[in-house]
Every structure is written in C-alpha cells, then in structure tokens.
Amino acid sequence: MNKIKITPSVPTHMEVEKIKENAIRLHVYPYESGYAISVAHPLRRLLLSSTAGYAPIGLKIEGVQHEFDSVRGMLEDVAAFIINLKNVRFKLRDSEQENVTLEYEFSGPKELFGKDFENDLVEVVTPDAFLATLNEDAELKMSIIVQKGIGYVPSEMIRDLLPQGYIPLDAFFTPVKKAVYEIEKVLVEDNPNYEKIVFDIETDGQVDPVSALKMAMNVMQSQMEIFTNDIEVTETVGQNIENSEIFYQPLDILDLSARSYNCLDKAGIKYVGELLLMSNEALKSIKNLGKKSLDEIQEKLSELNIDLGKLSDQEKETILKKIEQNKS
C-alpha cells in the first residue's frame, strides 16, 4: 500500500569489501531516488581534494644551485631526478608531525629506489619507485623536506616556505589514487525506485581507504555543521527611496560648508542620491576631501536619517533612474 512520507528514508546498510591491497568497494543503500548522487558526488570531490597525505616539498643537493643543474656521477640530471622523486610516496612514522627534514648520502655504483630512502623518520610506501643511477664517481648528499598537506600545491607557493638553498617542488599531497562511484537501482519492499551507491576507493598506502573515507566524511560534516547552529534572520531596513524626494534634490539642500560642497561638485556629485550611491571608502578617496569634511557630510546625512553604503542594487538603480529624469 502506498504511503505519503513526511521524511525521506535514510540508508541502513553498508557493506565494505577488499578488492586488493589499499583498495575497497563500498555498498551503501537504500537511498531515496536522487539522494545517492547528492551524497556520492561531493564525497568523491572531498576524497580527492581534502584527504591529508605527505609529499616532498623541498630538495637540496650538495653542489647544486637549481633544478637545471647536473650531479657528477649521476646519469639523470636534477630535473629528471625531481620528476622521479615525486613518484616516491613517503609516510611519516610519527603521525603527529607535520613535516620532517631527511638527510641522505649515497655513493656509487648504485641504482636508487624508493626503499633506499626509508629510515627511522619515514616509511616509503612505493619502495620500487626508481630515482637515479649512480656510477663509481658519484657522491650524492641531499636533504629532502617532507610535508603533510591536502590537495595539490604548486612550487611557486612553496618557494617562500623553504630555507635558503632548497629547490621548491610541486606537491601532490592526496593519497587517494582512485575514487569512482556508480548509482544502482535497488529493490526495497517491492519498490524499485530506491538507489545504492557503489564506491571504489584506492589509496597509495599512506593511509588506508577506510581512513581516507572517514577523513572525507569528517570534512563534509564540518562544512555542514554551521547550518545546525541557531539561525538569526535579520531584516533589511530600506530607506524608503521611492517616497524620499530629498534623494533627488541638489546637494545645496544639505547646507554643507563651501570646502565640502566644492570637493563633491568637482567629483561630479550634484545630487544627494548620487552621494548615497557611494561607499565610505569611495567617499574618502575623493580628492582634497579631508576627515573634517567627511565627518561633516556624514553628520548632515545622519540628521536626515540617511546612511551611506546601505542601499540594495535595486534601490541604487531606482535612484539613478530618477536622477536622470531630473537632469533631463
């Protein structure tokens, strides 16, 4: 029997299956028609943009001045080394730390891989990532700054955060490699109009997929929390511009001092309404209009119960039209 609902149904089932290492498939249902995508789409965006991870942000190599330099005994130039370094995914062993500076020394002949950069401070979750080939002449000394963050930050924004001598690196913080979803129909009490979210989440190993999901959900909840607070509705008090003929009168009616009047006149302000179209900042910027004149203008307007900068766009449009009519 059909019933008229007064509240939408909420999902009651969640199933999580492990697809492979650091990858899960999430099934959540049942959702009312149209609700599943309203949840899945922002969740995907948050997984990719707001899940915290780690990335190298600065590199210093002894004897190297910039990224277009080369290192004696290393087959790759510094630019190629940097590209390879971005593929190395670090994980700080102390989760409370936000950044660490790592010191390394390597000599050849040797091929460098991600696993060679693991130490007491960091774990490398991409141990097989290739970095460089050193020959017998190579003596490589370097420092790498690894930072915790979210999303993507270009090197231009990182440059000023680094100590002198470090090359800034583009930082890809997000540990989420894949976040895709499908919306499927699901039958609930013979009703085929309910929906199911099937969500695949894969990470690089810096965090596990379930932790990444929880981070994204926490971000979503925190963004929405403000709407659960007490909401105060304020009324916009208009200035009754339709019936206030004073708005369309010449400035003479304000009985301003000669200095104040002349400053406004030279600025092209002829009517009281034109004055009201200006903000306090715009008024202050008028040439030769000092603080004393500004105070006088505001005092004269206050006597008429008129406030600067309080008009809506519609009210401004009305004033402009009537002033143009008066001029013609």
UniProtKB/Swiss-Prot annotation:
InterPro entries: DNA-dir_RNA_pol_insert (IPR011262), DNA-dir_RNA_pol_RpoA/D/Rpb3 (IPR011263), DNA-dir_RpoA (IPR011773), RBP11-like (IPR036603), RNAP_asu_C (IPR011260), RNApol_insert_sf (IPR036643)
Keyword field: DNA-directed RNA polymerase, Nucleotidyltransferase, Transcription, Transferase
Record flagged with keyword Glycosyltransferase: no
Catalysed reaction, written as an equation: RNA(n) + a ribonucleoside 5'-triphosphate = RNA(n+1) + diphosphate
Entry keyword Acetylation: no
EC nos: 2.7.7.6
Location of the region described as Alpha N-terminal domain (alpha-NTD) in the Swiss-Prot/TrEMBL record: 1-230
GO biological process assignments: DNA-templated transcription
GO CC list: cytoplasm; DNA-directed RNA polymerase complex
Family: Belongs to the RNA polymerase alpha chain family.
Complexes and interactors: Homodimer. The RNAP catalytic core consists of 2 alpha, 1 beta, 1 beta' and 1 omega subunit. When a sigma factor is associated with the core the holoenzyme is formed, which can initiate transcription.
Domains as described in the record: The N-terminal domain is essential for RNAP assembly and basal transcription, whereas the C-terminal domain is involved in interaction with transcriptional regulators and with upstream promoter elements.
Protein name: DNA-directed RNA polymerase subunit alpha
